[in-house]
Regions:
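Amphipathic, hydrophobic secondary-structure cores in small proteins
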Residues: 3-56, 66
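Conserved short beta-strand edge segments in small beta-sheet-based binding/regulatory domains
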Residues: 32-33, 63-75
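Short proline/glycine- and acidic-rich turn/helix-capping motifs at secondary-structure junctions
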Residues: 38-42, 70-80
Length: 80
């Protein structure tokens, strides 16, 4: 259900809409989905080709964004 190629992240919950808008503006990168919006956990449905660029973009934003592994994200969301 949760692909290893997707980019998982944690950011301040109030910034989830901002992240979604930025990714939407880059049509080819992927689609943002909240894993647990109250905790600021989300992921971008990427391909192997766009995952690296998506990580770089998220880390370049003027807000704190932590890139997580799939396992870390699911554990933080209580979905192990």
């Amino acid at each position: 259900m949760f692909d290893e190629d997707w980019v998982y992240f944690q950011a301040p919950p109030a910034e989830m809409t901002f992240i979604n808008r930025i990714i939407e503006g880059c049509d080819y990168l992927g689609v943002v989905t909240a894993l647990d919006g109250r905790k600021g956990l989300g992921f971008v449905r990427t391909t192997k080709d766009t995952a690296g660029e998506t990580k770089e973009l998220l880390q370049s934003l003027p807000i704190p964004v932590r890139i997580l592994s799939r396992q870390e994200a699911l554990a933080a969301a209580g979905q192990q």
